[in-house]
Swiss-Prot record:
Coiled coil: none annotated. The keyword Nucleotide-binding does not apply. This is Ubiquitin. Residues 77 form a propeptide. There is a cross-link at residue 76 (Glycyl lysine isopeptide (Gly-Lys) (interchain with K-? in acceptor proteins)). It is found in: Cytoplasm; Nucleus. Pfam families: ubiquitin.
């Protein structure tokens, strides 16, 4: 199924995923497309931050859902 990931810059990334895919797996796909390390990615859906060990179906994420990607940058505060 396809889902969309919207970044803070307004860019939308399209990913091909399965409902059984873990959040980690989705972050790895984002890394493949965008080069962003998974440890810097925070994915938000329906106002909730998604945890690595859970799956898309755990969060009731269905085809053509849009996730929001927030980057957690290291240091600098």
């Amino acid at each position: 199924m396809q889902i969309f990931v919207k970044t803070l810059t307004g860019k939308t990334i399209t990913l091909e995923v399965e409902p059984s895919d873990s959040i980690e797996n989705v972050k790895a796909k984002i890394q493949d497309k965008e080069g962003i390390p998974p440890d810097q990615q925070r994915l938000i859906f329906a106002g909730k931050q998604l945890e690595d060990g859970r799956t898309l179906s755990d969060y009731n994420i269905q085809k053509e859902s849009t996730l929001h990607l927030v980057l957690r940058l290291r240091g600098g505060y």
